[in-house]
Amino acid sequence: MRFDTKIAVVLRDDLAAWQKANVTAFLVSGIAGTVPGLVGEPYRDASGNEYLPMFVQPVLVYQADAPALRRAYGRALGRDVSMAIYTADLFETGHDEANRAAVAGVASDELDLVGIAFRAERRIVDKVVDGLRFHA
């Protein structure tokens, strides 16, 4: 199945494995919570157990060094793409209110980005992530 949109996550390539998993989970939660119809129906196994629904389309995960991540962030902003961000400061906080305060206290050009995630039309996503490699 081909979708008109793509979901992309861009992670800074110098993160520890646990940080990559944590950042990805937090970033995609922002997308899931704001796009109606993006989450499908619950899953059920043959034994009758029910599981939570997931995205109806794939999530593409890219890696980038800090300058390339900043470039992708700028491209997304320049195209008015709504995105979730995760900054290094958020590793030191423990809840949503503190996370939002940490972001609010820093100008956009000074955010220490470690990851971004967004959903947009295919061609726009392709332009934002141009030159990036899939996460290995």
Regions found by a protein language model. Name each.
Residues 1-136:
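Positively charged, small/polar-rich N-terminal and surface patches that mediate targeting and assembly
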